[in-house]
């Protein structure tokens, strides 16, 4: 079941703010001191922004398509769509770039809509592998193209700021559907277009 547009109405703003105060006390802080008085409210408001993807259905962004494309049937690629997400294991930031390509099957979509699909999935608790598959599936299910390719690069704070503390490491994941999966030449053309390898730490 898709819970993307559902909100947990049983949890109030006040309860969410109290949860932040509990974490502050657990960390050894005093949430009543001046510098932290507004922190619970600010954190809850930030969460509303960071996780706004739960209130959206990414498929909706791809409903309006264009068929007057003068017979264009070659690959369409968007490179370097920046994103910010959060690891579902540690709630730590993931920052990176998404590259999306598809082979139209008689209709195309406005390029900004593909970026909105990326944003909608990124603004949730994620693992990069799942987000890669979700974006590809959304495009395939809604546009029915001849093929879809999605490559994501990400720098994971759960690896760079805790645990093993390895900075400068980026993770690359891919999902190929249709012709992108079945035809090596199509896949190679897509990978050549996107030129994976830009250091995401420069974002």
UniProtKB/Swiss-Prot annotation:
Residues annotated as binding Zn(2+): 87, 90, 158
Q: What is this protein called?
A: GTP cyclohydrolase 1
| Catalytic activity as recorded in UniProt | GTP + H2O = 7,8-dihydroneopterin 3'-triphosphate + formate + H(+)
Q: What is its EC number?
A: 3.5.4.16
Give a Gene Ontology cellular component term annotated to this protein: cytoplasm
> Could you tell me which species this protein originates from?
Xylella fastidiosa (strain M12)
The pathway noted for it is: Cofactor biosynthesis; 7,8-dihydroneopterin triphosphate biosynthesis; 7,8-dihydroneopterin triphosphate from GTP: step 1/1
Q: Which InterPro entries match?
A: GTP-CH-I_C/QueF, GTP-CH-I_N, GTP_CycHdrlase_I, GTP_CycHdrlase_I_CS, GTP_CycHdrlase_I_dom
Family recorded in the similarity comment = Belongs to the GTP cyclohydrolase I family.
Q: What class of enzyme is it?
A: hydrolase
The UniProt entry, under SUPFAM superfamilies, shows: Tetrahydrobiopterin biosynthesis enzymes-like
Question: What does the subunit comment say?
Answer: Homomer.
Q: What are the UniProt keywords, alphabetically?
A: GTP-binding, Hydrolase, Metal-binding, Nucleotide-binding, One-carbon metabolism, Zinc
Q: GO: which molecular function terms?
A: GTP binding; GTP cyclohydrolase I activity; zinc ion binding
Which processes are annotated in GO (biological process)? one-carbon metabolic process; tetrahydrobiopterin biosynthetic process; tetrahydrofolate biosynthetic process
Pfam families linked: GTP_cyclohydroI
């Amino acid at each position: 079941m898709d819970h993307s547009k559902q909100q947990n109405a049983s949890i109030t703003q006040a309860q969410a703010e109290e949860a932040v105060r509990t974490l502050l006390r657990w960390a050894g802080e005093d949430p009543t001191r001046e510098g932290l008085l507004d922190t619970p409210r600010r954190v809850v408001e930030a969460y509303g922004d960071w996780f706004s993807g739960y209130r959206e259905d990414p498929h909706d962004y791809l409903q309006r398509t264009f068929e007057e494309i003068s017979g264009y049937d070659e690959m369409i690629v968007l490179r370097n769509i920046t994103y910010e997400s959060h690891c579902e294991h540690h709630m730590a930031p993931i920052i990176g770039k998404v590259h999306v390509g598809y082979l139209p099957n008689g209709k195309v979509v406005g390029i900004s809509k593909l970026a909105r699909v990326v944003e909608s999935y990124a603004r949730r608790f994620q693992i990069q592998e799942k987000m890669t598959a979700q974006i590809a599936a959304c495009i395939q299910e809604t546009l029915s193209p001849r093929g879809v390719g999605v490559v994501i690069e990400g720098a994971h704070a759960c690896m760079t700021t805790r645990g093993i503390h390895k900075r400068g490491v980026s993770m690359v994941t891919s999902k190929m559907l249709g012709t992108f999966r079945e035809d090596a030449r199509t896949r190679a053309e897509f990978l050549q277009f996107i030129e994976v390898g830009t250091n995401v730490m420069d974002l």
